[in-house]
């Protein structure tokens, strides 16, 4: 009985801690999530992409895109942290966060299902990207940094941007 109560106290404490985090603080979860995702993908994604997307996709492509992504995640987290206002959060959401996290989850999960083979990155996409994305959305919503119109339009922009980016960089379609 006492052990159950200890676990419950831990959960209550964790929930209390999370409830005190602000959007501009939580945005710092983005860079380490991105880095951990890259570490999962790095050794195997290129060969997977060459098999299922385009034989033209190279390790140099992967490294260029993802080193820029690591730098970008830090730069954009810094900008949002310094200027947590609606316009900045919307641009971050539409062009960085939603394409990089939410649509990346859909890409990796979908690719794993369609190919019936592990798509490198699916584990961190599901265990890190999705929870971090949902937390940041919830905090942005509760702090009135995103509302229904900006959330919906941001997702539409993010979906189009992610589709273009993956089509260009991974599938070499254009």
Residue positions per predicted region:
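Cytosolic, membrane-interface loops and tails of multi-pass inner-membrane proteins
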Residues: 41-59
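Hydrophobic alpha-helical membrane segments
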Residues: 97-108, 121-139, 159
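Transmembrane alpha-helical segments that form the membrane-embedded catalytic/substrate-channel core
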Residues: 35-41, 101-112, 160-171
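Core segments of transmembrane alpha-helices
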Residues: 66-84, 103-104, 128-133
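Membrane-interface helix caps and helix-loop-helix hairpins in membrane proteins
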Residues: 87, 109-119
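Transmembrane helix-loop-helix
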Residues: 76-103, 143-151
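N-terminal signal-anchor transmembrane alpha helix
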Residues: 20-40
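Terminal transmembrane helical module of multi-pass membrane proteins
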Residues: 135-174
């Amino acid at each position: 009985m006492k052990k159950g109560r200890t676990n419950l106290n831990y959960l209550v404490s964790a929930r209390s801690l999370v409830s005190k985090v602000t959007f501009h603080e939580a945005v710092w979860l983005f860079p380490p999530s991105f880095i951990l995702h890259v570490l999962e993908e790095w050794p195997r994604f290129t060969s997977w992409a060459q098999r299922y997307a385009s034989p033209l996709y190279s390790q140099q492509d992967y490294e260029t895109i993802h080193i820029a992504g690591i730098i970008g995640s830090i730069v954009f987290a810094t900008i949002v942290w310094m200027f947590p206002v609606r316009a900045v959060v919307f641009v971050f959401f539409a062009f960085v966060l939603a394409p990089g996290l939410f649509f990346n989850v859909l890409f990796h999960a979908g690719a794993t299902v369609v190919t019936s083979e592990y798509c490198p990155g699916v584990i961190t996409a599901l265990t890190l990207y999705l929870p971090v994305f949902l937390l940041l959305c919830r905090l942005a919503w509760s702090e009135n940094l995103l509302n229904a119109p900006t959330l919906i339009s941001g997702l539409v922009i993010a979906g189009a941007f992610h589709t273009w980016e993956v089509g260009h960089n991974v599938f070499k379609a254009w």
